[in-house]
Amino acid sequence: MTKRVLISVSDKAGIVEFAQELKKLGWEIISTGGTKVALDNAGVDTIAIDDVTGFPEMMDGRVKTLHPNIHGGLLARRDLDSHLEAVKDNKIELIDLVVVNLYPFKETILKPDVTYADAVENIDIGGPSMLRSAAKNHASVTVVVDPADYAVVLDELAANGETSYETRQRLAAKVFRHTAAYDALIAEYFTAQVGESKPEKLTLTYDLKQPMRYGENPQQDADFYQKALPTDYSIASAKQLNGKELSFNNIRDADAAIRIIRDFKDSPTVVALKHMNPCGIGQADDIETAWDYAYESDPVSIFGGIVVLNREVDAATAEKMHGVFLEIIIAPSYTDEALAILINKKKNLRILALPFNAQEASEVEAEYTGVVGGLLVQNQDVVKESPADWQVVTKRQPTETEATALEFAWKAIKYVKSNGIIVTNDHMTLGVGPGQTNRVASVRLAIDQAKDRLNGAVLASDAFFPFADNVEEIAKAGIKAIIQPGGSVRDQESIEAADKYGLTMVFTGVRHFRH
């Protein structure tokens, strides 16, 4: 019995060669629309879909394959006499291979000028139906959705006259993943169109970006996936100019770094980061000086860290960074001379370029946190704050220099793991106290790191002080200005302690926990 294949593809890469090889193996080819035209033009004989269905393609191609002569030929079980009798009684011919890929919905909605009507018209109906029918009946039918699988199918057909069950099952699984992702993308688009912020079903689709050697630790398996609708300002979209593949921990740290620097758009800034905590932030009138400040913040912790710069890297800055062991450098661009300096004798240094002009668009994405058996979803902590809305709660007002330093500290503290404390001046971090289970321990840690540079320093806390002992520690160290959210039932005790020691303290009214 002659074997039949149905081919209907939007991605025509390799399809002519695939069909030609099938013809050599004696296969009969059914095809539709543009695919049939492409095959006919290449000299591959095909049967029109309407010759199989007895109906013409209609409604601008919306209806062409949704017919019992197609789906009966796909779904009929070869091991059931009743199915084979139904096929015979209704003059349905069996289809043994389906090669289908879908309308380019993703590519359509990514176009800057796409209309809603264009998006709707690129929702494939017949294609997913054929794929699912063939995949359901994979015991007898081979289904191909990815041109990368043409070769393995041809090899097995040439060698054995049919594909193995294992191959058909693997290809069916791929189809169900593909159609699920396709529908998830459509659901995501429509959910956004109607402004639904809390859908009762959440479907997310990501594409494999990079299989990883291991995860956070060597005993953990891991992979890196990218959103099906890519975000330009993202480590997943970064252009790697040098170095080894990014590790699991590299990616998490790099992501934290590019989030931090979004808050420092106005001035040349360098952020150094280790284990998702900033270990140095420097801000200046030029990027070289900003690097100096970030490095001087903590010359020890920066070793083996990640650095992100929000201005082009020039040769002078590259020379300074070249002398420090770094895992990753991220910047919007690099001069040719700077790149040559950084790469010299450092083939493993990972150098990434990112479009910093796409930062704002990245801020609207939701954050997803996995828990056992569930998923937490929240907006990013990108609330717009204005110092004009802050409240000085002490008798003493901040000086102009202190006010500038407090603004800088408040931007920096947002990215320190809770309980988080940071000590800064108006252009660089001096001490970081991250992740302690009580706030006074974080205060002591940050002060101890900054102890030789406390003259004129200020301190920021990511959440309120539950007791006045924090203020006591700060005053004892000689720090004269504090910024914190406020909101404790004991705020007045902290205010009184600040007044007692002549400190100025600002309440922002906004908490910045980070777990």
UniProtKB/Swiss-Prot annotation:
The gene is purH. One of its GO terms (cellular component) is cytosol. It catalyses: (6R)-10-formyltetrahydrofolate + 5-amino-1-(5-phospho-beta-D-ribosyl)imidazole-4-carboxamide = 5-formamido-1-(5-phospho-D-ribosyl)imidazole-4-carboxamide + (6S)-5,6,7,8-tetrahydrofolate; IMP + H2O = 5-formamido-1-(5-phospho-D-ribosyl)imidazole-4-carboxamide. The keyword Transferase applies. Its EC number is 2.1.2.3, 3.5.4.10. Disulfide bonds: none annotated. Pathway: Purine metabolism; IMP biosynthesis via de novo pathway; 5-formamido-1-(5-phospho-D-ribosyl)imidazole-4-carboxamide from 5-amino-1-(5-phospho-D-ribosyl)imidazole-4-carboxamide (10-formyl THF route): step 1/1; Purine metabolism; IMP biosynthesis via de novo pathway; IMP from 5-formamido-1-(5-phospho-D-ribosyl)imidazole-4-carboxamide: step 1/1. Keywords: Hydrolase, Multifunctional enzyme, Purine biosynthesis, Transferase. GO terms for molecular function: IMP cyclohydrolase activity; phosphoribosylaminoimidazolecarboxamide formyltransferase activity. GO terms for biological process: 'de novo' IMP biosynthetic process. It comes from the Bacteria. Belongs to the PurH family. This is Bifunctional purine biosynthesis protein PurH. PANTHER family: BIFUNCTIONAL PURINE BIOSYNTHESIS PROTEIN ATIC, BIFUNCTIONAL PURINE BIOSYNTHESIS PROTEIN PURH. It comes from Streptococcus pneumoniae (strain 70585). Residues 1-145 form the MGS-like domain. Pfam families: AICARFT_IMPCHas, MGS. The IMP cyclohydrolase activity resides in the N-terminal region.
